[in-house]
Regions:
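Generic structural motif
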Residues: 10-12, 30-32, 57, 70
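Short intrinsically disordered coil segments
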Residues: 22-25, 40-44
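Short amphipathic, charge-patterned alpha-helical segments
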Residues: 35-39
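Short, mixed-charge low-complexity intrinsically disordered segments
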Residues: 42-88
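Short aromatic-glycine-(Arg/Gly/Cys) micro-motifs in beta-strand/loop hairpins
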Residues: 1-22
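A short, exposed loop/beta-hairpin motif centered on an aromatic-Gly-Thr core
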Residues: 19-32
Length: 88
């Protein structure tokens, strides 16, 4: 069964998340790694895990992934959304 994952992609400054711009996504995948693969296909970027966040190969952007929870993430607008129409 596939789960929903909440994904934030933002820029970095000095190796830390900067949040001067932000894109939010909801991804349906079997695992967190599957969500990373889906975002790699969509963005055309490769991601590496540093223990806290996923960094792009260039290091200029980072990605955070968490389980999607309607209570916390339901009010955001998303750049891409894999929820079914009945779940929105």
């Amino acid at each position: 069964m596939k789960n929903l994952y909440y994904v934030e992609i933002t820029d970095t400054f000095g190796g830390e998340a900067n949040y001067s711009w932000l894109t939010r996504h909801v991804v349906r995948a079997k695992s967190e790694r599957g969500a990373v693969n889906a975002m790699s296909r969509r963005s055309g970027m490769n991601w590496r895990f540093d223990g806290m966040k996923y960094l792009s190969k260039s290091g200029a952007t980072c990605m955070f992934i968490d389980m999607y929870e309607e209570e916390y993430h339901g009010d955001y607008s998303f750049c891409s959304d894999d929820r079914k129409e009945s779940e929105k």
